[in-house]
């Protein structure tokens, strides 16, 4: 399931994150690459243990926890600390698939990467190129969202970032281990949750049918979740 999540960051919070990371020192983007990705990746990245990345990443994690659409779609168990990348002057990231297991160096923190997320931090009209292109069974999808908006997609997807030919593309990226490993099951739960909320808005949360459907949702989650 691929889903756009608008307004994860906005206003002063977005401005603060953008200021934190743009004023920091950037390094070669292969700092977090696996072998396959290192051959494909041409961009810059913030050192993951730097003060700017830690502070900005913490702000993003807090924002995710306050974003109901993200919680409903991802059913997150663990979130990898957000990283930050910068593309400009023809920089790109050729087709690759993300590593199945992500580890934070120097710690025992590791996750299974069920979902990948890209949070756009600058306006799309400030740069040319830089589209995130994701391939799935339904075809090829080009993504270039507004500042503060995020795209969530299965980490098993082949994807690439097209060359940035004008300006700079600034994003945060990270991975999520979901409580529900299977993408199809996770999609079923999301669709059911969305339908329940839509009907409840008309009939009320105390409607007997809404209560029964909510029970079905939680029983399916109980069957499929790993927590």
From Swiss-Prot:
Its cofactor is Fe(2+); L-ascorbate. GO terms for molecular function: 2-oxoglutarate-dependent dioxygenase activity; iron ion binding; L-ascorbic acid binding. Binds 1 Fe(2+) ion per subunit. Keywords: Dioxygenase, Iron, Metal-binding, Oxidoreductase, Vitamin C. Signal peptide: none annotated. SMART domains: P4Hc. 2-oxoglutarate binds at residue 169. GO terms for biological process: DNA damage response; intracellular iron ion homeostasis. Residues 78-178 form the Fe2OG dioxygenase domain. Fe cation binds at residues 96, 98, 159. Its EC number is 1.14.11.-. Pfam families: 2OG-FeII_Oxy_3, PKHD_C. NCBIfam families: PRK05467.1-2, PRK05467.1-3, PRK05467.1-4. HAMAP family: Hydroxyl_YbiX. This is PKHD-type hydroxylase Swit_4046. It comes from Rhizorhabdus wittichii (strain DSM 6014 / CCUG 31198 / JCM 15750 / NBRC 105917 / EY 4224 / RW1) (Sphingomonas wittichii).
């Amino acid at each position: 399931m691929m889903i756009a999540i608008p307004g994860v960051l906005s206003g002063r919070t977005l401005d603060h994150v953008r200021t934190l990371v743009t004023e920091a020192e950037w390094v070669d983007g292969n700092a977090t690459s696996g072998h396959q990705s290192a051959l494909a990746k041409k961009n810059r990245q913030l050192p993951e243990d730097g003060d700017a990345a830690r502070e900005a990443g913490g702000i993003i994690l807090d924002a995710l926890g306050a974003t109901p659409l993200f919680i409903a779609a991802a059913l997150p168990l663990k979130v990898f600390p957000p990283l930050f990348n910068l593309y400009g002057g023809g920089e790109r990231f050729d087709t690759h698939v993300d590593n199945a297991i992500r580890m934070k160096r120097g710690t025992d923190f590791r996750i299974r990467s069920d979902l990948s997320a890209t949070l756009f931090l600058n306006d799309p009209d400030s740069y040319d190129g830089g589209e995130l292109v994701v391939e799935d069974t339904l075809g090829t999808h080009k993504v270039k969202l507004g500042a503060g908006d995020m795209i969530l997609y299965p980490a098993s997807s082949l994807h690439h970032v097209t060359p940035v030919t004008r300006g700079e593309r600034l994003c945060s990226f990270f991975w999520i281990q979901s409580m529900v490993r299977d993408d199809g099951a996770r999609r079923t739960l999301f669709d059911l949750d969305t339908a329940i909320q839509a009907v409840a808005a008309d009939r009320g949360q105390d409607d007997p049918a809404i209560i029964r459907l909510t029970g079905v949702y939680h029983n399916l989650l109980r069957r499929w979740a790993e927590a």
